[in-house]
Amino acid sequence: MEASHLQIYWHDSQPVYSLTFQKNSANDKLFTAGGDNKVRIWKLNRDENGQNGGVRKIESLDFLGSLTHHEQAINVIRFNSKGDVLASAGDDGQVLLWKQEDPNTQQESVVRPFGMDAETSEADENKEKWVVWKRLRGGSGATAAAEIYDLAWSPDNRNIVVACMDNSIRLFDVGAGMLVCGQSDHGHYVQGVAWDPLNQFILSQSADRSLHVYGVILSSAGVVTGLKLRSKIAKAELPCPGDVLRTNYLFHNETLPSFFRRCSISPCGGLVVIPSGVYKVAGDEVANCVYVYTRSGILNSAGGVKNRPAIRIPSLKKPALMAAFSPVFYETCQKSVLKLPYKLVFAIATTNEVLVYDTDVLEPLCVVGNIHYSPITDLAWSEDGSTLLISSTDGFCSYVSIDTETQFGSRIEPPAMHAEPLDTDESAVAAKNQREAGGIVNMLPVKKIPCNSSDSKKRRIHPTPVDL
């Protein structure tokens, strides 16, 4: 593995809030979004020979274009599974759906920003031209929509769910361009959403210290007609020093210095990695962690204190802000702790570090630190799983290049997915780790580092810098 910076001004020195790779693209195209109200398109030029131990470094970048129809900062961008529609959303409260313009399309079809004609528009200088296909707005009017922090596509690309600053999530029908429903069950900003790849549930994570599980309501024709709140995960009975069980909060409160809490569901739908976790180490002293739930744990949860995670990944020096699974499946080299017939890889980002794990051993394969001066905002894996891109509020992006065959083993075809819960023998997991008090286990035998989460008690809209 090799980590490096990409030293360019991605968004005119403004923060970079989100990034994503275009799926099913013949080229390595990266899209970034930031505080300059623009989405920008880049082509990654790699070392195809892999002269650095099989690692394909990014040698240079080509700028391909800017998308300029947002009126305020853009917080999230995501492609649908086909890779032909890009969704972007941000502080202006609208979701824009972009499609690449056919070179044979007449110039008059391009929707230009107000006040710009064909001669003055920045769009005419782009190597690629993307047009706004649809605009999605929540609320009853143009000014009623709240700021959007995160979004997720449905697996069939028919719907989009967004996380809003007014404590709600909103569900849109992409084809109709209409709002299907909204849910206002959270007590604070919603900072992350994820859609189950098997289309059974949606997860939303909020600054109110909870994760909500919503069941997806489908019509007989398979059309999403609404959402139903299944459970709220906020507290659980967790093992504490002295082999006792105590009811504690699972997640950080609103003082967490980040816009985002981006949880991630594995591409098979069997695992959920949830950031911003905390746990008691002694008295009122808390430490940072990440919680891992199985699919059955999510679907069968009642939302009570006994809804314990399957695994706790502890000993993070700073709060975890987001997680992201690689889309690639690998042959398992040994018996998986979770009894998976394949190996998955995921990354966790704290405010100042990125850690890469696999599901075989659940120990860090690498820890990348001191890469940014201010908090990390997003993670994006390339389609082949060989590159992990990282964005930050310092206005820069960095990356980790990986020789996947050496680090992870041979790739396999994705297994056939079905909508039945994944059964996990949690007692076997507990026995393996010699833990009998409770269903949550520490997989990493490393020193626990307390979190200084009490340094700041004020409520904030914008994150404040942290000391690295």
Swiss-Prot record:
Does the UniProt entry include the keyword Chaperone?
yes
Q: Which UniProt keywords apply?
A: Chaperone, Chromatin regulator, DNA damage, DNA repair, DNA replication, Nucleus, Repeat, WD repeat
- Main localisation: nucleus
- Please indicate which superkingdom the organism of origin belongs to: Eukaryota
| Subcellular locations according to the entry | Nucleus
| Entry annotated with the keyword Cytoplasm | no
WD repeat intervals = 11-52, 69-108, 143-182, 185-224, 371-413
UniProt-listed PROSITE patterns: WD_REPEATS_2, WD_REPEATS_REGION
Its transmembrane ranges are none
The record's Gene Ontology biological-process terms are: chromatin organization; DNA repair; DNA replication; DNA replication-dependent chromatin assembly; nucleosome assembly
The record's family statement is: Belongs to the WD repeat HIR1 family.
Q: What else is known?
A: Present with 2130 molecules/cell in log phase SD medium.
Tell me the PANTHER family matching this sequence: CHROMATIN ASSEMBLY FACTOR 1 SUBUNIT B
Describe the function of this protein: Acts as a component of the histone chaperone complex chromatin assembly factor 1 (CAF-1), which assembles histone octamers onto replicating DNA. It performs the first step of the nucleosome assembly process, bringing newly synthesized histones H3 and H4 to replicating DNA; histones H2A/H2B can bind to this chromatin precursor subsequent to DNA replication to complete the histone octamer. Plays a role in the maintenance of heterochromatin.
Instruction: Tell me what this protein is called.
Output: Chromatin assembly factor 1 subunit B
* Lineage summary: Eukaryota, Fungi, Dikarya, Ascomycota, Saccharomycotina
